[in-house]
Amino acid sequence: MDWQTTSADTAPSSFITEEQDRSLFGKPPASGAWKESDPVGGRRFAGIGAFGFESGESLPFVRIAYETWGELSPARDNAVLVLHALTGDSHAVGAAGPGHRTSGWWQGIIGPGKAIDTDRWFVAVPNMLGGCQGTTGPTSIAPDGAEWGARFPFTTIRDQVKAQAAFADALGIGRWAAVVGGSMGGMQALEWAVGFPERVERLAVIAAPPHSTADQIAFNSVQLGAIRTDPLFHGGSYYDEKDGEGPHQGLALARRMALITYRSLSELNDRFERTWQSGISPLGDGGRFAVESYLDFHGNKFTRRFDANSYLTLVQAMNSHDVGHDGSGLAAALSRVTATTLVVGIDSDRLFPVDGQELIASHLPAALDGRVPLVVRSHFGHDGFLIEDDLIGGQLRRLFAA
């Protein structure tokens, strides 16, 4: 795969060229979020009204940005909800262009004749609550005329699914033919099946755990700290700052940390080894190792399309994830799932290891593969679910045939 022609979130690790480095010359914006003055692109918008959070806080109005593919049947019984990962958005299919800084993140999975066949299914992909690509989040304008920023309510996975349920109501969809999600989207998909079992016919949970772990929270805490300790973060009030004067260094550092967990040990070692970038020694001569250049490039690129407050909001939502946190416990929560379920793990995933998917599958009443997950072999680690179209697509075809 030529990673230069694919979405930034689906790119296998590779060397960075001088041309790519030059493409990021210039100061990054204070926030890389989509703005109302930007082109709409393929987005549509659905208002869901006032919204109450688990924390007890509320917003007077919430809007969901989304994109769709395929045609909704007259009976409204062919709708598929696809949920994106932490830094994804509604643009699952399509080229980069006005309104969309990256190309679609699941183009090999969604489309005519593909695993999620848009000749048969109506596919809806919303940007999650708290995101920064059109759905209400920290970059949205509060009633006082300023961005919500750090004032945005603490958001949980359950809050995000509640907003998605209201979004489904706005579309007139009472029951999804399938809910599909990977990574953070997989957390939401699982929460859908637990919280709204009567509204989910099929379920795919890909590379996601039943709850966050201490190890995952620890990695996340360092990323949160990188942003909060950036001297240009200003407690989350940076939206009026000039280009180059926002918390881009902290956000880029958080992204670099995250990328390490998204890739496998073997992929990074095999691709980069101890190679120098541009032939300049990193051993005292001011150069960088190639893997450092890769992380720097993608960290800096990320600041052009994401927002620091939104990143904090969404990472903390991931930390909140626990499908049994209502007091019933994990086993009781998962026993409520009635959907025909596909649970997929990736053998090289070091962000959400396979033991999490094993825990999910062991308590599900109607999993396709019984009490064990389907584990795919991939060189790419956690991001294999975004890269391995044939492997992941083949499993999704099984689910949609069920």
Swiss-Prot record:
Function of the molecule: Transfers an acetyl group from acetyl-CoA to L-homoserine, forming acetyl-L-homoserine.
Protein name per its UniProtKB record: Homoserine O-acetyltransferase
SUPFAM superfamilies in UniProt: alpha/beta-Hydrolases
Pathways involved: Amino-acid biosynthesis; L-methionine biosynthesis via de novo pathway; O-acetyl-L-homoserine from L-homoserine: step 1/1
Subcellular localization: Cytoplasm
SS bonds (residue pairs): none
GO process annotations (BP): homoserine metabolic process; methionine biosynthetic process
Keyword ATP-binding: no
Binding-site positions, substrate: 255, 383
Molecular-function GO terms, alphabetical: homoserine O-acetyltransferase activity
CC per GO annotation: cytoplasm
EC class (word): transferase
Source organism: Leifsonia xyli subsp. xyli (strain CTCB07)
Chain residue ranges for the region called Disordered: 1-39
Enzyme Commission number(s) from the entry: 2.3.1.31
Bias type Polar residues, positions: 1-17
Reactions it catalyzes: L-homoserine + acetyl-CoA = O-acetyl-L-homoserine + CoA
Keywords assigned by UniProt, alphabetized: Acyltransferase, Amino-acid biosynthesis, Cytoplasm, Methionine biosynthesis, Transferase
